[in-house]
């Protein structure tokens, strides 16, 4: 899983970037194991807001009609923000998989005359 991390108002050390990539990437990798590696690219943007808050935005495009994964989380601690973001991403990917690979079958009702 390739996660491109950019930041605004904060310098993120390489060690922290590695932690963030591991925290998000491992779970997303497991959920999207059926896709090829080049399709699993996400963009993570981290901003430092006023009052010591961190805002994390994540975007990822997957194949299919419902393939846009977008998540946002705000918290006072950077890693807690990333953990909350990961949970949102997990829910959205699960929803994407259910809609794409297990679509509800439309059944036709027949009327008896």
Question: What are these language model-derived features?
Answer:
Residues 1-113:
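N-terminal, polar/charged subdomain of small-to-medium soluble alpha/beta proteins
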């Amino acid at each position: 899983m390739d996660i491109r991390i950019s930041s605004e108002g904060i310098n993120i050390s390489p060690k922290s970037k590695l932690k963030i990539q591991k925290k998000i990437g491992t779970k997303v990798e497991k959920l999207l194991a059926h896709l090829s590696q080049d399709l699993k690219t996400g963009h993570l943007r981290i901003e430092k807001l006023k009052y010591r808050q961190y805002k994390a935005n994540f975007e990822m495009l997957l194949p299919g009609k419902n393939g846009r994964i977008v998540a946002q989380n705000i918290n006072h601690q950077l890693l807690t923000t990333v953990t909350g973001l990961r949970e949102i991403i997990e829910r959205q990917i699960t929803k994407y998989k259910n809609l794409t690979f297990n679509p509800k079958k439309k059944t036709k009702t027949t009327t008896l005359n």
